[in-house]
Amino acid sequence: MQNSVNKFFIYLFFFILLINCSLSKKETSNQNEDIKIIFQKLKPIEKELNPNLNIQLQKLTKGKPFLRNNTNNSGNINFETNFDNLSSFKFKKIDQFEFNQPELLFTDSNSIIFFDGKGAIFNINEELNVNWKVNHYTKKERKLNPILYFAQNGKNLIVADNISKFYSLNLNNGDMIWSNSNQSPFNSNIKIYKNRFLAIDFDNVIRCFSLEDGSEIWNFKTEDSFIKSQKKLSLALKGEIVYFINNLGDVTSLNINDGSLIWQTPTQSNVIYQNAFSLENSDLVFANNSIYFSNNKNEIFSIDSKSGIVKWKQTVNSSLRPTIIENLIFSISEEGYVFVLDDKTGNILKITNALRNIKDKKNKIKPTGFVIAKNKIYLSLNNGRLIKIDVLTGLQENIYKIHGSKISRPYVLNGNMYLIKDNAIIKSN
C-alpha cells in the first residue's frame, strides 16, 4: 500500500512538472511574439529608379577645386579626358594602401606632394619630375610604414601621420622647420586657418596647433570607442567654424578661435556605438549652408550648419565623399549605384547602375571615389578600372583599365587628371 502511494505522488510530481514546462514554453513563445524590432537594418538599394530622367547641370566650378578647398566640395569641374595619354611616377609601395585613403596635395606653385611606403616625402612637378625628396623618419619609424596627411601654409608644408608625429617642412627644399609629437596617431585630413592648423587623432580628439612652432592652442575631446576604425576622419571649415565627424558618427561644430562648442549632433544609435569599428563615414561636405555626408550603414544626411538640426536622412549606402552641384547631390553606393538627390528635400530623383557592364564578378567590385567634370562622372574602382558616365543620361561612355588593383579617387589640376595606386601616381591629360 505504501509503495502504491509513493508511486502515485511520484507520477503526480512529474505530471505537474511537465505541465509547468509546457506553460513556460508557451509563455516564452508569447513573449517572443510581443518583441518589437526597434533597430532594423535597411537593405541597400540595388534597383534603378527613373533611369530615363535627364539630369541637367548648368554651371561649371570656377577656380581650382582641389587647391585649398576647405569645404571638400569639388562641384562640376571644367575638365575632360579620354585617357589617351597616360604617364606615371613610381615610388616604394604603400603596403596598407588598400585600407587607407591617402591624398595628393596640390600646391600654389602647381607642384604635387605625396609620400611612399617608407615615409619619404616627394615634391614633383606637373610633368612628374622630382623637385625634391626627403625622409625625416628613423629606420625604426620607417618599418611602421607611416601614412601621411598634408596641408600647405604659404612656403611651408604641414605634415601629420598615423604614428603620432607632426611637423613643418620648407616647401622649397623639404628641410625640417620644427617637429612635434602627439599623444595619439592622427587619422584625418589637415585644415589651415590663419596662424593655426587642425587635425583629428585616433582618440576622437580634434586638436588645434600653432603653425609657427607646433604648440597646441586648444583641443576638444569627443566620445571615444575601444576599437578604432581605419577609415579616415574628416573636417571642413567655413568662416571661423570647423565641422568634424568622429568614428562614432557624431558631427560637431566648434569655434576655431577658442575651440568652444557650437553644437553636436549624434547620428548613430547605441547599437552602432558598440560596433564603431565597422562604421565608415564619408568626408563631410559643406554647401548651401548644410553639412552633407553618408555612411556604410545605408544613410545619407543633410545637417543645418548653423543649428546642427538634421534636415533630412535618406537611404544611400556609401562611405564615398558626395558632390553637391547647384541643388543636386550626387553619391555612389558601395554596390555601384549612382544616386541623384534633391538638396532641399532629400528625395531620390534618379538611380542608375554604374557597374552594369562590368564582367569581372570573381571579386567584389567596389567604387573607391569619384569626381564630376563637364557633366561626366569619373568613377574609380577597387579593381583598377575607371568608368566614365554621362550625367545627363546616366549611361556609361567608357571603361578604362588603369591598374590591376585599387586606384584612388581622381584629382584634377590644370587640365590633368591624377590617380594614385599603391606604388605610383598616374597622370592623364
Task: Place the predicted regions along the sequence by residue.
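Extracytoplasmic beta-rich repeat domains
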Residues: 25, 48, 61-63, 88-106, ...
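Blade/loop signatures of beta-propeller domains
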Residues: 31-88
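Structural signature of WD-repeat beta-propellers
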Residues: 116-117, 125, 161-162, 201-202, ...
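Loop/turn-rich, solvent-exposed surfaces of beta-rich toroidal or solenoidal domains
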Residues: 324-325, 331-340, 347, 351-389
